[in-house]
Amino acid sequence: MTREEARAFALRWLPAWTGNNPSELAAYYSEDTFYCDPGIPNGVKGREALLGYFQKLLAQNPDWVWTQIEGIPMEDGFLNKWHARIPVGSKIVECVGVCFVQLDSNGLIRRNEVYFDRTELVKEISKARKPAT
């Protein structure tokens, strides 16, 4: 995969993370996909299980926005350096992280592992959930 191909894929795929449409997002993944992120470090296997996770995750974060900073080609895919703007209560948490994206022969994601420091995000979620005193 070239840098241009990685960028083109990210321009189609990353917007599907916004707007709480888990079926649209899951359609980018193969039937036997593997996905993990800091919230599920052991990951999920298979599109059906991933869809269940996405239904919960996207419902909690319908307005977050993910954009690519850089795509670095690797075997069968790319390393995606990304930026996320995540609304939490009245604050916007900004995160930079990486994930690797490996595609199958049909151009669907067969492996997606997401890594970032979620310290600030967890702190803001905890503050937003505390009842006002």
What do these predicted ranges mean?
Residues 34, 91, 107-108:
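Residue-level signal for well-ordered, solvent-exposed loop/turn and beta-edge residues enriched
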Residues 96, 100-125:
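Short beta-strand edge/turn micro-motifs at domain boundaries
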Residues 59-60, 85-94:
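Short, cysteine-centered beta-strand-loop-beta hairpins and adjacent loop/turn segments enriched
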Residues 1-4, 127-133:
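Basic/polar N-terminal segments that are highly enriched at the extreme N-terminus
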Residues 31, 88, 105:
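Short, ordered coil/turn segments that flank beta-strands lining enzyme active or ligand-binding pockets
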Residues 3-4, 15, 22-75:
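A solvent-exposed, acidic/Ser-Thr-rich amphipathic alpha-helical stretch
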Residues 54, 66-72, 83-84, 96-102:
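Hydrophobic/aromatic beta-strand elements that line small-molecule binding cavities or substrate pockets
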